[in-house]
Structure formats: C-alpha cells, structure tokens
C-alpha cells in the first residue's frame, strides 16, 4: 500500500513523501491518526503540484539568500564596546549584538542563524562568524570589535 505522509514520521519519512507501507500499518495506524492519506491518483496529482510550488518558492529563497550573502561579503563590520585594561570588554559581544550590527548595515537576519567561532566575545580584536541564510547558503565572515573612543 502506498501512502502520502501528512506529517514527519520517525523511521518512515517526512511530510509529503510517498512511501510504501504494509496494509495494516497504513489502515490501522497512519491513516486513522492523521499521519498519512491513501495515495490515490488525485492525491498524487495534488502532491506533485504542491512539490512544484514548493520547489519554486525554495529557489526564490535560495536566490534571495545568495544576494544577502554577497552583500555581507562586501561589508566591513565593526562593533564598538567599552573595554578596560588589557583589552578586556565590560560584558561580552553575543549573537544578538552581531545581528544588530548587521541590521545597521542592511543585512536583516535573526540572531539564531549566527554562530560566532569560540562563543561569546570578551576581548577586543578580529573574530570570525558563520551566518546561515538558508540551509544551502552559509557565509563565513570576519568582524572587528573595537573599543569606545
């Protein structure tokens, strides 16, 4: 029996996958619990149309992410912070601070998509970070942490 999954199912597949299962598993568990629907010809047609639309939207997201990554590569990012003796910061620079600095430069991104190498920053200097615009578009960049003048 072939079914189309409506939700992700462990050890079976992801949403909108067409999978072959045993008749009892499909009829007695997957379909009644709302995890799947029977793969009728009309359901297959709807699935193929849905997948086409999703692929088109996904490509648009990838193109937009690539533009953002290109924009990021051309930027010089500097974050100013108060520092004490030995270039040690009062506090630390986090993903949120870096997201705010990027927003000022025109790159809007949520802080959860930023990964600073080595964790939070506690000293002045140059650091590397990774920005995940999309699961297929990842950009590495450097930024400077400078003291208040």
From Swiss-Prot:
<dbReference type="InterPro" id="IPR000244">
    <property type="entry name" value="Ribosomal_bL9"/>
</dbReference>
<dbReference type="GO" id="GO:0019843">
    <property type="term" value="F:rRNA binding"/>
</dbReference>
<dbReference type="GO" id="GO:1990904">
    <property type="term" value="C:ribonucleoprotein complex"/>
</dbReference>
<keyword id="KW-0687">Ribonucleoprotein</keyword>
<dbReference type="InterPro" id="IPR020594">
    <property type="entry name" value="Ribosomal_bL9_bac/chp"/>
</dbReference>
<dbReference type="InterPro" id="IPR036935">
    <property type="entry name" value="Ribosomal_bL9_N_sf"/>
</dbReference>
<dbReference type="GO" id="GO:0003735">
    <property type="term" value="F:structural constituent of ribosome"/>
</dbReference>
<dbReference type="InterPro" id="IPR020070">
    <property type="entry name" value="Ribosomal_bL9_N"/>
</dbReference>
<keyword id="KW-0699">rRNA-binding</keyword>
<dbReference type="InterPro" id="IPR020069">
    <property type="entry name" value="Ribosomal_bL9_C"/>
</dbReference>
<dbReference type="Pfam" id="PF03948">
    <property type="entry name" value="Ribosomal_L9_C"/>
</dbReference>
<comment type="similarity">
    <text>Belongs to the bacterial ribosomal protein bL9 family.</text>
</comment>
<keyword id="KW-0694">RNA-binding</keyword>
<dbReference type="InterPro" id="IPR036791">
    <property type="entry name" value="Ribosomal_bL9_C_sf"/>
</dbReference>
<dbReference type="GO" id="GO:0005840">
    <property type="term" value="C:ribosome"/>
</dbReference>
<dbReference type="GO" id="GO:0006412">
    <property type="term" value="P:translation"/>
</dbReference>
<dbReference type="InterPro" id="IPR009027">
    <property type="entry name" value="Ribosomal_bL9/RNase_H1_N"/>
</dbReference>
<dbReference type="Pfam" id="PF01281">
    <property type="entry name" value="Ribosomal_L9_N"/>
</dbReference>
<protein>
    <recommendedName>
        <fullName>Large ribosomal subunit protein bL9</fullName>
    </recommendedName>
</protein>
<comment type="function">
    <text>Binds to the 23S rRNA.</text>
</comment>
<keyword id="KW-0689">Ribosomal protein</keyword>
């Amino acid at each position: 029996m072939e079914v189309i999954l409506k939700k992700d199912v462990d050890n079976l597949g992801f949403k909108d996958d067409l999978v072959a299962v045993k008749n009892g598993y499909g009829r007695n568990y997957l379909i009644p619990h709302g995890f799947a629907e029977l793969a009728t010809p009309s359901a297959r047609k709807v699935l193929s149309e849905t997948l086409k639309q999703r692929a088109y939207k996904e490509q648009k997201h990838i193109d937009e992410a690539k533009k953002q990554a290109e924009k990021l590569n051309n930027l010089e990012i500097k974050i100013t912070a108060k520092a004490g003796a030995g270039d040690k910061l009062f506090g630390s620079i986090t993903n949120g601070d870096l997201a705010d600095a990027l927003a000022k430069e025109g790159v809007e991104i949520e802080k959860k998509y930023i990964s600073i190498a080595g964790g939070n920053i506690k000293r002045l200097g140059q650091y590397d970070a990774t920005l995940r615009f999309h699961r297929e578009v990842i950009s590495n960049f450097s930024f400077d942490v400078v003291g208040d003048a």
